[in-house]
């Protein structure tokens, strides 16, 4: 959510900034609603004051034994008019809130201006793209040939966009989770956190998934209003909702492994085969809570921490700065890490690292006390995948395949697999 004061005082500036995203904000309509709000608030307060004065006068007249019926009728008329104006004011406030909750974040000045992913800017590359002397296979072809990845069985159990993994591939998948957690905890200093995988609407509103992106979520039946979490960013970031932190507590740096559940409502026909885009997948998430002045340095660190995982696994990747037309709604600035997939002959997203600035904190009322001014200020929140586990498995399978369809294990993962160094076709 954007700053209400900024919206009220300079809606045209907001409209200009959001237009960089391709988002149309009707500043004129918003300003008209604001004028109505201010007029109704002044009028309502005036009526309230007048009714209070007349009610007091009735009490004084009654104590003197005077006839108060004419005065009571006037107060009742004022009361009816006051209730009508309160109803009108409530409706205006609801309209303003609906607009405010629909607005995306203002992009940081360093974000490249562009329309879509074609306008994203490559920042750096790491690693050499492998050259194969044989026709490469996709991860799903490799996994099915190994007899350890079964999409048909998953479709039978549930439906499309699910997978069943068995044997060494399932073990490799689990090893990746432990490897990522160990690196982030032991070397990067994150605190591990375990959170619910089911969240309520308040949590989703706080991090920005609601109300705009409900179609992307799995909502549970029943009266609780619960949803399956689409990313552990949601429950982890909400651990500071409605809190006033001390400056000494910042930065907070959490790492969390969780399953994620997404309906992929807008991805019909995209990545229909394999594990690239699934309804259920695992992710190791990094979340930072910082002071405002520290958040952009934190974004660079968070991104580098995610990069370390790819470097340890010796997977070629690149870092891309997303343009204004491609960053997520709540983000002020985002770097994507894209890993090389030989079967597609291209880089694919494996992590998205974002600075949300105060966008989520304002919704969550997540604050800290500034020791220099003693003022209560909003924190900044950041998040990034460190990494998406399934896509990391995909990248290993494709980059470490040989001509026989075997998968060689990266050196960094061998200690987690009890000496297994190759997953072989039998």
UniProtKB/Swiss-Prot annotation:
Pfam family, one: Seryl_tRNA_N
Keyword ATP-binding: yes
GO annotation, cellular component aspect: cytoplasm
BP-aspect Gene Ontology terms: selenocysteine biosynthetic process; seryl-tRNA aminoacylation
Xref: InterPro entries: aa-tRNA-synt_IIb (IPR002314), aa-tRNA-synth_II (IPR006195), aa-tRNA-synth_II/BPL/LPL (IPR045864), Ser-tRNA-ligase_type_1 (IPR002317), Ser-tRNA-synth_1_N (IPR015866), SerRS_1_N_sf (IPR042103), SerRS_core (IPR033729), tRNA-bd_arm (IPR010978)
Residues annotated to bind L-serine: 231-233, 285, 385
Pathway assigned in UniProt: Aminoacyl-tRNA biosynthesis; selenocysteinyl-tRNA(Sec) biosynthesis; L-seryl-tRNA(Sec) from L-serine and tRNA(Sec): step 1/1
Family membership: Belongs to the class-II aminoacyl-tRNA synthetase family. Type-1 seryl-tRNA synthetase subfamily.
Task performed by this protein: Catalyzes the attachment of serine to tRNA(Ser). Is also able to aminoacylate tRNA(Sec) with serine, to form the misacylated tRNA L-seryl-tRNA(Sec), which will be further converted into selenocysteinyl-tRNA(Sec).
Name of the protein this chain belongs to: Serine--tRNA ligase
Taxonomic source organism: Legionella pneumophila (strain Lens)
This protein's encoding gene: serS
